[in-house]
From Swiss-Prot:
It is found in: Cell projection, Cilium; Cytoplasm, Cytoskeleton, Microtubule organizing center, Centrosome, Centriole; Cytoplasm, Cytoskeleton, Microtubule organizing center, Centrosome; Cytoplasm, Cytoskeleton, Spindle pole. This is Centrosomal protein of 104 kDa. HEAT repeats lie at residues 522-558, 603-639. The keyword Methyltransferase does not apply. Its main location: other. Pfam families: CEP104-like_TOG, CEP104_N, CEP104_ZnF. Interacts with CCP110 and CEP97. Interacts with ARMC9, TOGARAM1, CCDC66 and CSPP1.
Length: 926
């Protein structure tokens, strides 16, 4: 049968001081394991030598919580390699590799326990550790291994195959199957199968158990198997129960040892002494109970001394390493998951001490049995010292009665300590009703006693006869609620769960059974619910989920639902100093119960739910805000009109808040309006741009046609006038006055020499001339002071917020809608001196003079180019000066320039479709 194989560390590529690879030879709750040197070269290597040549069946690795190797390779060899000779490395045969989790999901607070099933024969095992996973805790790029466990059996190759074949042949003829035991009671336990691996050989067992107690458990397990073989089932049952109790004892002693080591490291020697004495008393009490029931004495054929200490198997040339090392960071803790080390211990240490300590056990005491006797025994069979004297002959086995079994169970688990004076005063009413023994159990420092007290109280309340006096029933209920309140605050999950079970029984069974009133149910809920809600914000995810599920379940009890108490607690506004978990749990509970209970006679109303949800929209935690949005949408489905009363109006200013934008878009979906996707929006913009360009071209063609007709009409009129003048002014010599020809503009060159923004036409407006006009003179354009691009004044605000190179330095004022530098924005908003902007359909808002004026595109031309318009348009001064200059000139040159000066107020309108974004926003860069 495969079992635990002892080993020694032959070599390693290096280690950090105090974290030698020899630490891997010890399995205990306080071990620290091996760590590579800081900033080491990869790969790192460790070579182990097993106590004998064996067939390895299973390898277990307990990884560090943050010093994690990305990959670990396994090699096996029959003999020790000599690294000085290169070809000797070929002696190792590669078995494969495993990849380790980077532990990001647990925040580097859990240790991964990796089990690898192999089938290889050898005596030397080599582990190669590759590059570490990077995380914020592993600042030195190290890899570490807390523990390694090897499970296998001796490799007797000459007989193994024959024995295996013979066993299979016998099973075949007897109709047995190793995977389908004949006795269903043996399924999953030891049944004589050759491939069975005992749970006591698992690495998780040793890493949580006190070493002495773990060795005693192994002895009792051997005796249990012998008793089963001899069909002494009563004795086997007794041993099975003792093993179960001892596992709890071992976990407790292991935790005491960790707390003692932590106290020593903090130089709190009083606490260390107290823990040492506590361990000694508890250990002596347990051993006394075991001796009382004959559990420390083996059968005559199984008797073995308990006189040798647990120590690693080391060769004479490799001295023992007993060096204390510092504890792990306080943030580290073991988490029980499918792939992580477990189980979770029910009793947690005090808050002042870390949950782990990495210290080595003390060196073995001198004066024990000779070393030669140790080497005869297999590594995992070495006995531990229990008493200084040698045990006598085994006593005869006696039948154990049920009452005796109960006494033993209580003795092994430990009796509750007496109540202190403070506890006596605090729980005086409960003691008078329930008795001091039960209350002492509920106040005990041992979690098992606290749990047993609650279970005993549960049983006591269930057995209360129906005809009991009402006063006694109410006193019993109030005393029970008092203990429940204390247990709800317990940090141990099993005690907390027992309190929930007891509270549920009181509300759903005890009160209805004895026909107590609603006042008693109200008393239970009011006293327990605030504490339950606080536990819903616990840092432990396991306790948090238990509390959330129970609150939801309790709110649906028919006895509690009619009281409408729980909804009134949940709609209370979130406190600013509340924990993140509590805020998330409260909004999550409200969302759950709102779906289950609705708003009709449930304690939830549209008013109180919406007030809570709107206030939750301002919470600092994203998950809280997201759940609040979901609550508002749920309320809108049922009460749309009442829901809208608690929200701001749906306008562009409100939609600038992303949460309200999501809310109103959700309303639209609920109402049946189909909102376009982002792809659809982009497609619509492209279509709109094309339509605008097409419309612009059509308008230009229409304008060109109109101007052509006007020129033809004007030419006809001028021709008639010229004929009349010709007749009137004809001189005797037959000469006629020749009028200068009127210049005509071809239709296909109408846009030549024209500014499409201000409408000015000038012969100097060539391609370069227009660039100069845009850059310096056009009244509709301006230069951005930050990126020096030329933009339309009407779109200056949008440019500063979305297109400018310095756009990250601007914010939008919700009052005037202008782009304000972010460092000035808080003061700008606070003073409220800006001119409020109106909706685009009502008025335009000028970013230069900050005034509102008539809406529309033409209004921009009037405002920016007219004499009574914008007073802050600096280009207007230059144009006015340019227009008045010809009037001040003298002579024909001045008159000629006056007649040829371009008109500022051109009547050519700006195209209604507007320009494409590429041409209307940014025109040139210096």
């Amino acid at each position: 049968m495969p079992h635990k194989i002892g080993f020694v560390v032959v070599s390693s590529s290096g280690h950090e001081d105090g974290f030698s690879a020899r630490e891997l030879m010890i399995h205990a709750p306080t071990v620290s394991g091996w760590r590579s040197p800081k900033f080491c070269q990869f790969p790192q290597e460790i070579v182990l030598q097993m106590v004998e040549r064996c067939r390895v069946r299973k390898l277990q690795l307990l990884a560090h919580q943050y010093m994690i190797s990305s990959k670990v390779e396994f090699y096996i060899s029959e003999s020790l390699p000599e690294y000085l000779v290169p070809y000797q490395a070929e002696r190792f045969r590669r078995l494969g590799y495993v990849s380790l989790c980077d532990n990001e999901k647990t925040g580097c607070k859990a240790r991964e326990l990796k089990s690898v099933y192999v089938d290889a024969v050898g005596q030397f095992l080599k582990l190669i550790f590759h590059q570490n996973h990077a995380n914020k805790y592993n600042i030195y790029n190290q890899v570490a291994l807390v523990a390694i466990n090897i499970i296998g059996d001796p490799a007797d190759l000459g007989d193994e195959s024959n024995i295996t074949s013979r066993e299979k042949l016998i099973d075949h003829y007897l109709g047995h199957s190793p995977h389908n035991p004949e006795d269903p009671a043996l399924d999953g336990t030891f049944s004589g199968r050759s491939d069975y691996i005992s749970p006591l050989d698992d690495l998780a067992f040793d890493m949580y158990q006190d070493p002495e107690v773990a060795q005693i458990i192994r002895r009792l397990d051997e005796r249990k198997r012998e008793a089963v073989k001899k069909e002494r089932y009563d004795h086997a049952k007794k041993l099975k129960q003792a093993i179960a109790d001892l596992q709890k004892v071992g976990e407790r002693l292991g935790r005491y040892e960790v707390e003692k080591r932590c106290a020593v490291e903090k130089e709190d020697y009083d606490l260390a002494k107290e823990k040492k004495q506590q361990m000694a008393r508890y250990r002596a009490q347990v051993y006394e109970q075991l001796e009382l029931h004959g559990l420390l004495q083996g059968e005559p054929e199984m008797q073995r001394p308990f006189a040798l200490p647990l120590q690693p198997l080391a060769s004479p040339s490799s001295p023992q390493h007993w060096k204390a090392v510092s504890s792990l960071p306080r943030t580290e803790k073991l988490v029980a998951e499918d792939s992580f080390a477990g189980p979770v211990l029910q009793e947690k240490p005090s808050a002042s001490s870390p949950q782990h300590s990495a210290v080595d056990p003390s060196p073995p005491a001198a004066g024990h049995a000779p070393r030669s006797h140790t080497e005869v025994l297999p590594y995992d069979e070495r006995p531990l010292p229990v008493t200084r004297k040698q045990l006598g002959e085994a006593s005869a086995e006696a039948e154990v009665k049920e009452a005796d079994s109960d006494v033993r169970r209580r003795g092994v688990a430990g009796e509750p300590e007496p109540l202190t004076e403070k506890a006596l005063r605090e729980a005086s009413a409960a003691i008078d009703t329930l008795g001091e023994a039960l209350v002492a159990g509920a106040y005990s420092k041992m979690w098992s006693c606290r749990e047993d007290a609650l279970l005993a109280l549960y049983k006591k309340l269930m057995e209360m006869p129906v005809g009991t006096q009402k006063e006694d029933l109410k006193n019993m209920l109030r005393a029970s609620v008092f203990l429940i309140r204390r247990a709800i605050k317990d940090i141990v999950a099993s005690v907390f769960q027992a309190s929930l079970k007891l509270l549920k029984m009181i509300i759903t069974q005890y009160i209805p059974k004895h026909k107590l009133g609603k006042l008693d149910t109200t008393h239970c809920v009011e006293r327990a619910f605030p504490l339950l809600l606080a536990r819903a914000g616990d840092s432990s995810a396991r306790l948090r989920v238990m509390a959330l599920n129970f609150i939801q379940e309790m709110a649906l009890f028919k006895e509690v639902k009619s009281l409408q108490l729980i909804p009134s607690y949940l709609v209370q506004p979130l406190k600013a100093n509340a924990s993140v978990h509590l805020a998330m749990s409260q909004v999550d509970l409200l969302a759950r119960l709102l779906r289950d209970l609705g708003t009709e006679s449930s304690g939830f109303t549209v008013d109180n739910v919406m007030k809570f949800a709107v206030s939750a929209l301002e919470h600092r935690v994203y998950e809280v805000r997201e759940t609040a949005v979901r609550i508002i949408l749920d309320m809108y489905r049922q009460h749309p009109a009442l829901t809208l009363e608690h929200l701001p109006p749906d306008d562009s200013a409100t939609r600038r808040n992303l949460l309200y934008k999501a809310i109103f878009e959700g309303f639209a979906k609920i109402d049946g309006s189909v909102l376009p996707t982002e792809a659809e929006v982009r497609a619509q913009k492209r279509v709109a741009t094309k339509e605008a360009e097409k419309q612009k071209k059509e308008e230009m063609k229409a304008l060109q046609g109109q101007s052509g007709e006007l020129r033809e009409t004007q030419a006809g009129v001028q021709e008639k006038e010229s004929e009349a003048v010709k007749l009137r002014n004809q001189d005797p010599q037959g000469r006629k006055a020749v009028l200068p020809d009127t210049p005509e503009i071809p239709a296909n060159h109408f846009l030549d020499n024209l500014c499409i923004f201000c409408g000015e036409r000038n012969e100097s407006f060539t391609e370069e001339g227009l660039d100069l006009h845009y850059w310096k003179h056009c009244l509709m354009l301006t230069r951005c002071d930050h990126c020096r691009q030329v933009v339309e004044i009407s779109s200056l605000t949008e440019h500063l917020l979305t297109e400018c190179d310095r756009r990250d330095g601007f914010g939008k004022c919700p009052r005037c809608s202008e782009a304000i530098p972010k460092e000035e924005l808080p003061g700008h908003i606070k003073t409220k001196e800006c001119s409020p902007a109106k909706p685009e359909k009502v008025a335009n808002h000028c970013p230069l003079c900050h005034e509102n004026f008539a809406p529309g595109e033409e209004a921009w031309k009037v405002h920016l180019m007219g004499p009574a318009g914008c007073t802050m348009n600096l280009r207007k001064t230059h144009v006015l000066y340019k227009a008045t200059a010809p009037q001040q000139g003298k002579g024909p040159a001045a008159a000629k320039s006056s007649t040829s000066a371009p008109k500022v107020g051109s009547k050519i309108p700006t195209p209604k479709g507007g320009l494409s974004k590429s041409s209307s926003r940014t025109y040139m860069r210096r």
